[in-house]
Amino acid sequence: AINEYWHGANMSFALCSLLTQGLIDAFTLVGTEEEKKTYLPKFNSGAWTGTMNLTEPQSGTDLATIKTKAEHDGENWRIKGQKIYITYGEHDMSENIIHLVLARTEGAPEGIKGISTFIIPKFLKDESGEYTIRNDLKCISIEHKMGIKASPTAVMSYGENEGAIGYMLGEEGRGIEYMLSLIHI
C-alpha cells in the first residue's frame, strides 16, 4: 500500500526504488549466496540502487540483435557496448549504482539464446573492502524527455578503455529469462 501512495505522489522519484526492487527479485531468484550477501543488504537499505540495461541504439526492442560484448580475461568478465533509455542510470542519490546489463559472450549463439546478464557496479571494491574504484563505465548523456523529467534517463557506455568489469548473474545464455523475471513478464 505504501508503494501506491509513493508512486501516486511522485512517480519520477519512485521509479528508482521500483527498479531496485526488480534487482532484489533477480538476485533472490538466481544470485549466489555471496551475491545475495553483498548486494541485498545494500539494496534494502537504499545505500545502493539498481538499473536494467537492455536497449541499444541499433537494436531498439529487438534484443536478439544486441552488440554489447562480454569477454572473459581469465579473471573477470570485461563488458563493452552502449545502452540507451536507462532509467536512473546516473545519479547522486546512492553510494553505488548496480547495473544489470545484457551482453553476448564470446562464441554464444545468435539470437536471444546467446545473451547473458551481467552485474556491473559503478564502483568496485578496493583493497580495504570499500567501493571506491570507478569501473570503466560512464553516462554519455541524459535524455531530454516530455514527461517524467525528474527521473534521469541515461545513455550508458561500458568499456571505453579496458572494459567494464562485470560478474555473470546466473547461468550463461539465460539473460533474457532473468531480465524478464525482473520486470515480472
Where are these regions (language model features)?
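Structured core elements
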Residues: 51-53, 67-71, 78-80, 85-87, ...
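Short Gly/Pro-enriched turn/cap motifs at secondary-structure boundaries
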Residues: 58-61, 90-92, 109, 145-152
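Conserved small/polar residues in nucleotide/adenosyl-binding loops
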Residues: 183-185
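A short core secondary-structure module
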Residues: 76, 80-130
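Long, acidic (Asp/Glu-rich), low-complexity accessory segments flanking structured domains
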Residues: 160-177
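Gly/Pro-rich turn-and-neighbor structural signature
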Residues: 27-71, 77-78, 84
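Flexible, small-/acidic-enriched active-site or ligand-binding loops
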Residues: 130-157
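Internal helix-loop-helix
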Residues: 1-37, 41, 45-46, 94-98, ...
